[in-house]
Structures are given as C-alpha cells and as structure tokens.
Design a protein with these regions (language model features):
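Loop architecture of class A 7-transmembrane GPCRs
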Residues: 1-11, 76-93, 97, 120, ...
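Extracellular N-terminal segment of 7TM GPCRs
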Residues: 1-35, 333
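Intrinsically disordered regulatory tails of 7TM GPCRs
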Residues: 1-9, 126, 140, 162, ...
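Extracellular TM2-ECL1-early TM3 structural module of rhodopsin-like
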Residues: 11-23, 47-112, 117-128
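Helix-to-loop junction signature of class
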Residues: 22-26, 36-39, 64-80, 93, ...
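Cytoplasm-facing ends of alpha-helical transmembrane segments in multi-pass membrane proteins
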Residues: 30-41, 59, 66-70, 98-122, ...
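Hydrophobic alpha-helical transmembrane segments
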Residues: 54-55, 107, 135-140, 182-186, ...
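Intracellular effector-coupling site of seven-transmembrane GPCRs
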Residues: 60, 138-139, 168-177, 188-191, ...
Length: 333
C-alpha cells in the first residue's frame, strides 16, 4: 500500500489472500494454542519442566500474535482502508512483530535446551542450564529483548492518507524508507538470522548425534525411539526453515528494492507480491508449534486425548470418562 505514491503496484490479491489466510490462522491458532495453554497451565501438575516453561511462553506469544490479526483481516478485506485510528495501527504493527520475533527466540531457546540434553546429557554446566530457573530467566530475557528490539516500530508505524484513503503503513511512510532501511536490516539480522543460525546449528548437531547412536544401537527398541526423535527434530527444523526463512528473505529483498530502485515499477511489483504471499506462510507457524508440541511426546498426546474425552463426554458409564495412559486405564469424573 505504501507503494502507491510511486508505482501502481497490483494489490487486488491482498483482498482475498490475506483475509482468508489470516482468518484461518486466527481460528486454528486460537484453538491450538488455547489447548496447549490449558494442558500446561490449567491442569494441576506437580512440577513444570523447562520445556513446559518455554512452550507456555511460546504459546502466549503465538496467542497474542493471532489476537493482533482481526484488524488486519478487516483492513485487507476493505482494500487497505484503516478505520481504527493511529493508536491501534501502532499497537497492531508492534504486537504483530513482537510476537513473531518472540516465537523465533523461544524456538531458539527450545532448540538449545534440547541440544544440551541430547549432545551433553551429563555435563555439569549443561545440566545447570537446563533447570527451571534458567528457563524462567531465559524467558524473561526473551520478552525484554524482543520488546526493546521492536519498540522503534511504535515510531515508524502510523496512519496516513493514500489516494484519499486512510491506511496503516506496515513499515513506515514512503518518505521515511531511507531512515527505516537500517532498522529493517537490523530486524533481519538480529531478529531472524541469529535465532535461525542457533536453531539450525542445534538441530543439525542433534541429528548427527542421534544418527550415530541409532546406527550403533544393537537393540531395536532404543533404535526405534531414536529414529522417532530424529524424525521429530527434522520436522521441527523444516517447519522453522520453511515458515520463517522465505518470509524474511522476501522482506529483506523488498527493502533493498524499495530503497535502491523505487522507480522500477515492474520489479517492485514482483518483490512486493512475493513478500505479501509469504506473510500468511510465516503466520501458520503459530499453528504448527502446538501440533509439534503434542506430536513429539506420548504423555502430551495423552493429555490432549484426556481433554478431548472430557469435551466430547465419551463415557463408558454415567459420570465416568476413561483415558488410556500407557498400558493402564484411569477413570475420572
């Protein structure tokens, strides 16, 4: 939308692609992350693991992310018209980026936690870093750093007039793109590239260790468990790379084109469409995180089944719902 001052870029696809995809992300993200929070917070558990702390914070970040989508859905459906005022414009842009970057940073924390557990399971320093206290400290640090990192968005994002229509600039207005450009690169490097390198390095190291242990295992049972762990690690890595990588590459390319060759309307149109098309893909990561959380653990899948059993009231006798846990059955009211 900020390109209308220079080039008549094509924006009709946004009235269909973004509202539909954001609406789907909103519904799925709200349900899945709400379920994850219920399983980790509302159930009375005796103790919290470090992974639960990280995943709870990740679910909160994803939940806040999807809650910022409804104004964007309405605005995109109305052709970028922004009827909500300047304060909500700044707030939506801030929370959109804040929780996107929190998600990447918490995924980096989870990857480091798992890396230490797999590659250095008995090293004293690694064991100390995997405690609940360290997880709480790391989570607080992530929220603080992400808020500080995204705070300039409150200055750059604002409402403005384009073709006699009030819009909410996603990055900043066209006149300030030269000033915004260094900050945009900062977000790409510090906000995305650093967590990306951490996640890829940790999971690649884990896959190497798990592969070597599986190859040297004589018993079928440990080998099968490690193969499952290996497939989980690979799946998480692929989700992270495919969700976050293309979006940030397209966004960075768009920044360079927007600043260096703003008069090349054809090129600008191509890179802007590419950037906008990848936005829904990065949004779907907030739906994938809860699925990976439940899929990667038998105990968590049992928790989810217990919740579904309670919700659907599958009873074998009045007032009793049976939930299979391991090889035994437990009954609850």
């Amino acid at each position: 939308m900020e390109d209308f001052h220079i080039c008549p870029v094509n924006s009709y696809y946004k009235r269909f692609l973004l509202p539909v995809s954001y609406s789907l992300v909103f519904v799925l993200g709200l349900a899945l992350n709400g379920t994850l929070l219920w399983c980790t917070c509302c159930r009375r558990t005796r103790s919290w693991s470090s992974t639960s702390i990280y995943m709870t914070n990740l679910a909160v970040a994803d939940l806040l992310y999807v809650l910022s989508l409804p104004p964007l859905i309405i605005s995109n459906a109305r052709g970028d018209l922004w009827p909500f005022g300047d304060v909500l414009c700044k707030s939506v842009r801030f929370f959109f980026l804040l929780n996107l970057h929190c998600s990447m940073m918490f995924l980096a924390c989870v990857s480091v936690h798992r890396f230490l557990g797999v590659c250095f399971p008995v090293v004293a320093a690694a064991v100390r870093l995997r405690t609940r206290r360290s997880a709480l400290l790391a989570s607080g640090t992530v929220w603080f750093l992400a808020a500080a990192e995204i705070s300039p968005t409150l200055l750059f994002a604002h409402t403005g007039e384009i073709n006699n229509m009030t819009v909410c600039f996603e990055m900043t207005n066209p006149r300030n793109f030269g000033v915004y450009f260094p900050y945009g690169l900062f977000l790409a490097i510090v906000g995305f590239l650093v967590p990306f390198i951490i996640v890829v390095t940790c999971y690649c190291s884990m896959m190497k260790v798990l592969s070597s242990r599986t190859a040297g295992s004589i018993s079928n049972s440990p080998a099968l468990m490690r193969n499952r762990s290996l497939s989980t690690v690979l799946l998480v890595l692929l989700v992270f790379v495919l969700c976050f990588g293309p979006y940030h590459v397209a966004r960075t390319v768009y920044l360079f084109v927007r600043v260096d060759v703003p008069a090349d309307c054809q090129l600008l149109d191509v890179v802007m469409i590419s950037y906008k098309v990848w936005k829904p893909v990065v949004s779907f990561n907030c739906c994938a995180n809860p699925l990976l959380y439940f899929w990667g653990s038998h105990r968590r899948r049992q928790q989810l089944r217990a919740w579904l059993c309670w919700r659907k009231k599958r009873r074998v006798q009045p007032g009793v719902c049976v939930v299979e846990v391991g090889s035994r059955n437990r009954t609850g009211g």
